[in-house]
Structures are given as C-alpha cells and as structure tokens.
Amino acid sequence: MKLHYITTREGLEKAFAELWTIPKLCLDTETTGLDARVNDVRLLQLCSTQADLEERVVYVIDCFKCSDLDGLKSLIESREMILGHNLNFDLQFLLQIGIDYKHKIFDTFIAERCLVAGSKEKKTSPKTEKVFFGEISCSLKAVVERRLDIKISKEQQVSDWSKSELDIEQIEYAARDVDLLPQIAKAQLAELATENLVEVYSLESKVIRPVALMCHHGFNVDITKVKQLKAKKQQELNEATNLFCESLDARLPDGFRLPRHEDGTIAVGKNAKKEFNPGSNIQCIKHFNQIGTDLPVDDRTGKQTLSQVALSEFDSDDLTLNLLRKRTKIETALAHVEKILENINPISGRMHSGYNSYGANSGRFTSSGSKRVTGKKKKETWGINIQQVPRDKEFRECFIPSEGYKFIIADYSQIELRLAAELVNIPQMIDAFNKGLDLHSLTASLIYHVGIDEVKKPQRQMGKTLNFALLYGMGFRKYKTYSAQSGNIITLSEAKTAHAGFHRAYPRLREWHRERSAMVEDGWTYVRTPTGRRRLLSYDDATMSACANTLIQGAGADILKIAIANLGKHINEKFRPIATVHDELVFEALEEKANEYKTILETEMKEAAMTILNNVPVKCDANVAESWAEK
C-alpha cells in the first residue's frame, strides 16, 4: 500500500487528477462522532477497487486541513461504483457535506449479512467466561479476519479524530481499512454467485441510498405539541399515583400504613427508608401481600411479579391492583414522550432514527435510533427507536411534515396473512382475499360456527388475535398471554378451545407447521424466501416457529425492499423518504406534488408485492396527511 496523506489544495488537485481516471472507487470515512448531523468528516479515504494491484495507492484526504473541497462532489457523484463497508453510515456524512451518490454500490457489510444471516460461532462471555453460540459478527475487523486471515486492531476507531494534528497511527489505520476492501469484495462476489445470492445482494444494495436518506432527513417534530403531551401525561401520572396510593393506604392495616410527610400527606418518592415508591415492584408486592391481594406469578421463577406482561394477562377485579395497572401504562407513555424530546437533534431540530436494512436475519429492517458516543469513556448509546413510538393519535400527531410539504403514508393491508395464504397455499384464505372478505371475521365465523355477517365485534377481535398469533405455530399457553396483551383476557381452557378451533378451520396451516417442524428435526436448516434470501437456523434458532416466520416475514421484507429500491429513482427534494415502520412507508412530498407522488408510492408498493403474490390480491392504502396520525 502506498499512502498519500493530503492536507493542501495543491495536493488535493493532484489527487483529483489521478482519481478521475479511476471509475470505481473504494470509500471510507473517519468522523469526529457517530451523528452525521452533529459531527464532521475528518478523513476521507479513496482508492481503486481492483483487487489484484501489486501496490494500491490510497488517498487520505484531511477535510479539516483541506477546507476547500471544491471538486470532491463532482468526483464522487460521477463514479460508476463505490465500494465500502457499512456505507449507510458514510453516505449520511457525505449527504451532510452536499454529496448524494446515486449509482452502483458494493457494500461488504451487507454482502456479508446476505452470506452469513443466521450463522453462529463460539463466543466467550467476558463477564462469566461461559462459552455460548452467538451471531457471527459482520464488523470490518471480523470480516477481514474471516475472509483474509488478517488480524487488525480497531483501537484507533475511538481515538480523537477532532484534534488539530492526527497521529501517524490514525492515518495508517484509516488507509489500511480501505486498502483491504477490494480483496474482501472479490471473495464475497465469488461466494454470492456460488450460493445463488447475487440477486438478493443486488436488491439490498439498491436500498442503501434510500435508507441513508431516510436517516438523513428524519422526522419533523412539533416540539410545542410534544411538550404539551408531556405535561398532560405528567398530570395523568400524578393523578393516577395519588389514586393508587390512597387506595392502597386505606386498605393497609394499622402499623403498616404508607410513610407520611410532616403535614400528614403520603410521602411518595425513591428514598426507600422514608418514602413509598409506586414504581418499585418490591415495595408494591409487599404491600399487596399485606392487604391480601392475589398477584400474578412468574412461571420461570415461581415468584410473584408485577411486570407489565404479567399484569396485562392477569384477570383481577381488585380495584387497587387495577389502579396500579393504569398507573404503569401512563408511566410508560410518559417515558416515551420524554425520549422523543431527548432525541430531537440540536442541529436539525428533527428526530433522526438509525435504520439497519438487514437488521433481522429474516431480512427485515430494524430501527435502533441514532447512534452516538457520549461521556468521557466514549460510551455508545442509541436514541429513540421510531418503531416503538406508540401508535396512539396523541403521539403520532406530534410528527409533522416540513413546511411546504405533506406526508404521504402508505402501508400494506394484512400483508403477512396474504403471504401466508399464497406461500402456504391455504385455500380458505386465498378464497376470502379474492372475494374481498374480512379475514378476521371469517376466522371468527369458522370458530364460532356463525355466518360471517353475524360475527360480533368481540368475536372479530378474537379472530384477529388468532390469525396473527397462530400463523407461526404459537401454542395455546402462549396464545393466552398474547390474547391478554391484546386486551382480551381469557382462561387457559378458552385458549385451548380457540387454538383447536383455529386449526380445524385451517387444516393446511397445521399441516404446514408439521412440515416446518420436520425441516428443523436435525437441529439446523436453511430457509429461503421466494426471492432467494437465505437464513440459517441452528442451535436455539432451529424451531418450527422460526422456520415458519422466516419464510413469511422474509418475503415481506423482500416486498418492502423491492418497493424502496424501485422508489429510489423518484427520490429528490420534492419527494423524500422519512421513515419505515414494519410494513409502512412515510415520505414527504411538496404540497403541489403530493397527489402525484401518492399515486407513484401506491403503484410501486403494489407492483413490488405482485412479484410474490400471484393468487392473492394486493391491498396497499396510501394517503396525503398533515401528520403521522392521519394514516
């Protein structure tokens, strides 16, 4: 490797002259932090993508010293291909300095995810020193060691990239990373072809730019409305706390009453010796036992519990316990509001979520919030996960389009059930979808033996819960818990009856579950989606439910990504990607272009689904909106 460290305009122009002759470039960045809206690009590393060069020239551009980067935008944006590792990150930083690369991408991180999805390796816990099987890492360090048998240090990754003079170790570290990429890519390309994963990777690569833009744009937030919501939830929490404490205190025997302030009011706080903390399960369980209230029991430990899951499925008419249940829900909602406020970017004034387009081994997106480094110890933390923002109107109406824009919100209707009907070949479901029947009502009618027009609202809700819970082979005990979490508390006997009735209604589904069970009998299997996406199921992942889930949810991921990839050619300042949540896409469009882009979004999503759904109709609903609540 021959390293050119560039710190002057003269050196930059010479490098540009040489780089313009290279149509395909390896690219990497070193930045002062992980937030592209707050931090800066310190180094930009560029070199040829040719894997067989005897001596590769790596250009390391110091963006702090070369303050005039004129010419960089045209150079990068005109390349035939960019090769990098986890380019979602680098593209966000390039966008921040005005560079929007729109051509072919080869991302060694995404390629590795395609190749090793679900694969595991022996690892040792640093705390307990126990050996376990964990996910194979796709970090550059791990990929280099696995593919090239070269061990590299990443110590410099967390060094100070903002200081005026960089160490030679930092510069060499930056150059070395980009120098290894062509060899990795060569090995991956060969394996992608051998494993019939070229088309899957091609799809994944087309999603990278739209996802980087999604992270870059973020959600516009009505801060005033969020603060009003926080005040409202705080008031509700105070009232719920008072009602719960008063109810509990009134039932406690003399000598066990809740602690008091000098004025006689109940002392509520986190000082366990002097105050009562209604958020402390230990304190609450003790007092509930003193008043003789039955509490849920954790099946794993055999001990009483007040966890949200346990409370949600515990049938009780105890007033005090139900007041605690209500208080817990409000406290959780308040925590969500506070997290929204904490994660509004100080530079953009927007909320930027981080997306991993291959976050789940099934191929589905994951959102983990914006990644950032805080504190003297350079601790990595994550911001809000946009997928966890409550669906309630009062939350979603806080997310609004930019001035002069409208939201276009589109999602697939019952896409997992439609995919199951198609891929599993469930005749009753295929017939229902083609006739435009409500599948949840159909399920209820088959279980309760009534006409579909006679199904009552609670029965339809039961049908809906069954459809989503039992699709992947959930047992009746887990179904009881799932039903309670959906707001319908049932007995174990009722869960067992409904479970059996569902499988009588859809015998092909039960047969498919048996087929999936047989696939994992040996403790491992490969599952492929209709597009060829592959996932290895092994060790504790080799279950029937995971085998079923991977086919359906993996196909759903394929459909959504085909839509995003095809929408890439339409993306510009008039039409911008904002978010993806499960099967939903949110875009911003200029007001005068909103209806035009609504049609484009709806059409692309329908056509994407039709690549897999041949016997079942696609239903995709899109609408123009003033807030995220207007879905």
Positions of the model-derived regions?
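Active-site-proximal helix-loop-helix substrate-binding element of RNase H-like nuclease domains
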Residues: K2-Y5, D35-A193, Y201-S205, L437, ...
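Conserved catalytic core of nucleic-acid polymerases
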Residues: H216, S348, H352-S353, Y358, ...
